[in-house]
């Protein structure tokens, strides 16, 4: 599962979602991408399951870029524990998704295969997404 090796602070404050993501909203590496429409918390297991679906369909033909990494710790207190006594221990790591963020990028494959792979991967994610592609201007 994805987790950071070292953090400046062991526990963070609660994540607040912003309106729209200006950073990471365009394609940087590949020709096709999966863009988030909604906002949610994304953990390492969800990223890994989506990556497995994409690599199963694309195989070794194309290149996959993952643009998100769960680096925010999520704390949780054990069950049957009374309130108080400090913040709970770190349970998992998340990434806060804002609308407009590109999560995965694909290159080196044809459009139909890329669309199939990214649409199947979107079923593994807890928010709605859309398929985007790089627009090329030829004169």
UniProtKB/Swiss-Prot annotation:
* Pfam families in UniProt: Ribosomal_L16
UniProt entry keywords in alphabetical sequence: Ribonucleoprotein, Ribosomal protein, RNA-binding, rRNA-binding, tRNA-binding
GO terms under biological process: translation
Q: Which Gene3D superfamilies match?
A: Ribosomal protein L10e/L16
GO terms under cellular component: cytosolic large ribosomal subunit
A single GO molecular function, which one? tRNA binding
Functionally, this protein is described as follows: Binds 23S rRNA and is also seen to make contacts with the A and possibly P site tRNAs.
Matching PANTHER family: 50S/60S RIBOSOMAL PROTEIN L16, LARGE RIBOSOMAL SUBUNIT PROTEIN UL16M
**Subunit-structure text:** Part of the 50S ribosomal subunit.
Q: Which family does it belong to?
A: Belongs to the universal ribosomal protein uL16 family.
Protein name stated in the entry = Large ribosomal subunit protein uL16
